[in-house]
A protein has these predicted regions:
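Catalytic machinery of carbohydrate-active enzymes
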Residues: 1-352
């Protein structure tokens, strides 16, 4: 510890600084899209509790766009390829408190290297998840992950304001009228066809069946890796269905979700972005399960899953393909049920 830090610890201890609001926080969550969006209530509520505080957030570079327009943050730090450089940057910032919402080996290393800063670490419940996925015994608390994130900062006096998730889109990345077909300007259903793992995604043939049954214009959302599947689905009706996969940035895709009449999504980041905009969501689950505590937060939603499958959940994240080869958790999903629910929600939306 250098002399300046030593002086500050003696004459300006964190406990006294926090009472005066003259306090500096670092929040850590490296990935991924949905997980970072799910931490946004912590950012907002921390700011409400300590309006005069300095609040920074450390994440991976590819996810920085999720946070860079967040008005409750003062700075977004990027995880460097050189880990020691990241640790040095954290030390140079002289934080009073570090809020670890990732709690992995990297954050443990940070904690071990920066011993003079109080750490508040999120409980990931990995052992309980392992028991659930391997033995199908659910001992997880029936608590949403957002509320578990909030529990991490309870000792700092931070209280959940109940306002849900945040997602802020800069004006420069909002979608213009000319960016989507004229046929979709008066309303559309956004379907997020992607996911980080294939076992979280409906097969293309199932999605083709779904869009055939939906009577309203549809915009397909996903990354460049989903472009080919999007083209196959859009072939069903090229006028009704617009394949936006790989054509827009994350923030632009978020804006398309923001303006949608209804969002249909797998258990993925776009579902949580939709929840931030308080959209009605039809949430389709494959190998993962809602009881992991990551359903859409503080918005209207319906869950679609194949119940009473002995093999679910098979993973807390997902696989490239079904470990048993049958993929019943998605192949047995009813597209009639999803389409009927979609039309019900859309009917209410039009009447309003």
């Amino acid at each position: 510890m250098n002399f300046k830090k030593f002086y500050n610890k003696i004459w300006n201890p964190a406990s006294s600084k926090i009472k005066s609001n003259d306090v500096k926080f670092l929040i850590i969550r490296f990935s991924s899209i949905g997980d970072i969006v799910l931490t946004t209530p912590v950012i907002r509520c921390l700011r409400k509790k300590y309006p005069g505080a300095t609040i920074h957030y450390l994440t991976k570079k590819k996810f920085a766009t999720i946070l860079q327009s967040n008005p409750y943050l003062d700075k977004v730090l990027l995880l460097e390829d050189n880990f020691n450089k990241t640790v040095q940057e954290i030390e140079n910032e002289e934080y009073d408190y570090i809020i670890d919402l990732h709690h992995n080996l990297r954050t443990l290393r940070i904690k071990n290297l920066i011993r003079d800063v109080p750490f508040y670490s999120f409980n990931k419940l990995n052992i309980k998840k392992w028991i659930y996925t391997n033995f199908k015994i659910n001992t997880l608390p029936q608590v949403h992950i957002v509320d578990r994130y909030m529990a991490t900062v309870e000792k700092l006096g931070v209280v959940n304001d109940g306002l849900g998730l945040d997602y802020f889109i800069p004006e420069s990345e909002k979608v213009k009228e000319g960016d989507i077909p004229f046929s979709h300007l008066h309303g559309y259903v956004a379907i997020a066809i992607g996911a980080a793992h294939n076992t979280k995604k409906l097969p293309v043939e199932k999605l083709k069946e779904l869009v055939e049954k939906i009577k309203h214009p549809v915009i397909l959302l996903g990354g460049k890796e989903d472009l080919s599947n999007g083209e196959k689905i859009a072939e069903t009706d090229p006028i009704k269905i617009y394949n936006a996969c790989g054509k827009f940035s994350l923030n632009e895709s978020a804006d398309i979700v923001r303006n949608a009449k209804l969002v249909i999504s797998h258990d993925t980041g776009m579902m949580h972005i939709a929840a931030a905009f308080k959209k009605n969501i039809l949430s389709v689950w494959g190998n993962t399960v809602p009881s992991f505590g990551m359903t859409p937060y503080k918005t209207n939603y319906e869950v679609f899953q194949v119940n009473k499958l002995w093999c679910r959940p098979c993973s807390k994240t997902g696989f490239d393909k079904c470990p048993l080869g049958h993929f019943k958790c998605m192949n047995e999903q009813s597209m009639d049920a999803i389409a009927l629910t979609a039309e019900t929600y859309l009917g209410k939306e039009i009447k309003n």
